[in-house]
Amino acid sequence: MQLCGFEVGIDQPLFLIAGPCVIESQEMAIETAGQLKEITTALGINFIYKSSYDKANRSSNKTFRGFGMDEGLKILDEVRRQVGVPILTDVHTEAQVPHVAAVVDVLQTPAFLCRQTDFITACAQSGKPVNIKKGQFLAPGDMKQVVQKAKEANGGADTIMVCERGASFGYNTLISDMRGLAIMRETNCPVVFDATHSVQQPGGQGDKSGGQREFVPVLARAAVASGVAGVFMETHPDPAQALSDGPNAWPLSKMKALLEVLVDLDRVVKKAGFIEHTV
């Protein structure tokens, strides 16, 4: 699949989607994107910057949601202009799709909305690549139907990615079943693993979600060893002070060290091939 000027897939080098959970300021967005670009350029990793203009599914209405669509899109457009990186952001309603698609390079659908047919259809018809997050409530094999809806809407174009972000396992807990990554490859779409939301503890701090960022490298390594097209990681210069999803954000200062390991793993795994495809 062609994505932002490069090829992605199970037979292509690992690519990265990364950035702060929510836009906190234009200055921080530009600085973070610049540092990530420097890191990924040095490591030869294709990179897409991610940040949200609105966190529409916060646990509480007392927590920070973001700048809103209009101001947020202006900031993301400025990040692309100044830093020179492609941009991905979430879209939350059908009405937002044309406005967001006019600015960013890749649309992302929230996991909670993966079963909303009209919403998925609108995103797929936008003309932009779409990263569809698998719902925490959905079996990996059920993503075939989600992809079918999207492909029927976009005329069968290769513009759809699917993203694993953990499965609900009791209250306030997510787990990652690495078999799901192989199952989702059967959609014939690039598979992305969200290593940071997979360690989230939804609603685990009462009015906001908790997380266990120490397990981000554990799951990221396992996913890359299983075989994925890309990795998604939210990162922050100071996760303890992040306005959204700080407990599961990976520290920006540790991003290069983690990516070095993931790139090495990716090369080994993809060079060896996938013997599971032979049985």
From Swiss-Prot:
Catalyzed chemical reaction(s): D-arabinose 5-phosphate + phosphoenolpyruvate + H2O = 3-deoxy-alpha-D-manno-2-octulosonate-8-phosphate + phosphate
Organism for this UniProt entry: Methylobacillus flagellatus (strain ATCC 51484 / DSM 6875 / VKM B-1610 / KT)
Keywords: Cytoplasm, Lipopolysaccharide biosynthesis, Transferase
Protein name: 2-dehydro-3-deoxyphosphooctonate aldolase
Involved pathway(s): Carbohydrate biosynthesis; 3-deoxy-D-manno-octulosonate biosynthesis; 3-deoxy-D-manno-octulosonate from D-ribulose 5-phosphate: step 2/3; Bacterial outer membrane biogenesis; lipopolysaccharide biosynthesis
One function term, GO molecular function aspect: 3-deoxy-8-phosphooctulonate synthase activity
Compartments reported by the entry: Cytoplasm
Main location as per UniProt: cytoplasm
GO cellular component, one term: cytoplasm
Gene3D superfamilies xrefs: Aldolase class I
Pfam family, one: DAHP_synth_1
Enzyme Commission no: 2.5.1.55
Database matches in InterPro entries: Aldolase_TIM, DAHP1/KDSA, KDO8P_synthase
Gene designation: kdsA
